[in-house]
Amino acid sequence: MNAFYNKEGVGDTLLISLQDVTREQLGYEKHGDVVKIFNNETKETTGFNIFNASSYLTIDENGPVALSETFVQDVNEILNRNGVEETLVVDLSPKFVVGYVESKEKHPNADKLSVCKVNVGEETLQIVCGAPNVDQGQKVVVAKVGAVMPSGLVIKDAELRGVPSSGMICSAKELDLPDAPAEKGILVLEGDYEAGDAFQF
């Protein structure tokens, strides 16, 4: 689940995205201040638009909204008050974590891409990376699937030149860190970081 709020740009509407849906598949139902968006073919709920959001919630963010247990409980209460008989169950595990690059191999179909195996604590992800400085043995910042980058980009499972990739190894610039270097390259962490630790920025 991802949530977005931009009062000046969109109006007083909280946008909640659960999964992608094409325009051709798009269906919706209005329940009071809530519009439920669903896939017409599968009938799966793909998101909600909550109008007059500030009358229900205090949202300080402008753009992606940080998810928490309290926020999810509040959204479920809003759905319930507006007659939507659904309860959101959300993975609140950190989406930006420390990763350890266990291996790096040349991409079979692209000279400037590398295929990396990255340990992120509870699992090892295969991530295709285009940074020239990525290497085995580094500790890096990984945006896992479901992460929302400062730019608004949502990280999804992808296939890059025929090779599956689950997540992104981040640069300081992509993380919008102050004093990020101009040259292209991932952020390599120094110090006592452990794979799987949440990365705070």
From Swiss-Prot:
Source superkingdom: Bacteria
Domain tRNA-binding: 90-200
Keyword RNA-binding attributed: yes
GO molecular function, one term: tRNA binding
Keyword Iron-sulfur on entry: no
Keywords assigned by UniProt, alphabetized: RNA-binding, tRNA-binding
Family annotation (NCBIfam families): YtpR
Name the UniProt record assigns to this protein: Putative tRNA-binding protein YtpR
Source organism of the structure: Bacillus subtilis (strain 168)
Gene designation: ytpR
